Amino acid sequence: CEKLLAEQFNLPTFTVLLEGALEKGKDATAGGAKVNVGPTMNMCGFGTMVDSVAAIKKVVFEDRAATLEEVCAACMQNFVGYEDLRTKLQAAPKYGNDDDFADAIAADLWKWFSTCTMRLKMYRGHYCDAAVQMVQSNVGYGAMTGATPNGRLAGMPLSDTMSATQQADTHGPTAAARAWAKAKASRISDLAVPRATIRWDKLIISYGTSRLGVE
């Protein structure tokens, strides 16, 4: 992948803006940057995965309200005939609410994914970086993904980036931010805030540090 990228998909305009690239005589795709990282191994649907594992742990292993086989069968049938089980799975703790039950699972899963990814040696000698797919990828991948143990129906979008599952973060932005911090995901999450909750006359935007805040 890296070799083909350097040979066939050069980025000359981008390269001339990089410090040290012209001196090296290398395109950005061929290691011309002062600091070279990547490529990345991208994950999609982190929140969906966390909530699914949390639901299985809670419903199957702690409450013993269903077997793992029953959960698998429910997902295979898109929860048709398993509506009561789906309700139980949906009631399990959700990532993004400062809930230690779900957030501990999130931290473990991200550590596992990033550790496994960084073991991969890449073409230019760097390790592979763990990353997440950004906006819109979750919709396309969700359309191709069957039902999941968190109660999500087949074909519905997966969760976006490393943020919580859509409408699952019900305790506000502070709780969501605390969950990201526990998962070490604060720099690669996004957050939707209702317009009615923002004091626009007090809004502070800092583009340089990618921060948005309120006085």
Could you say what each language-model-derived stretch is?
Residues C1-E215:
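Acidic, glycine-enriched catalytic cores built around paired aspartates
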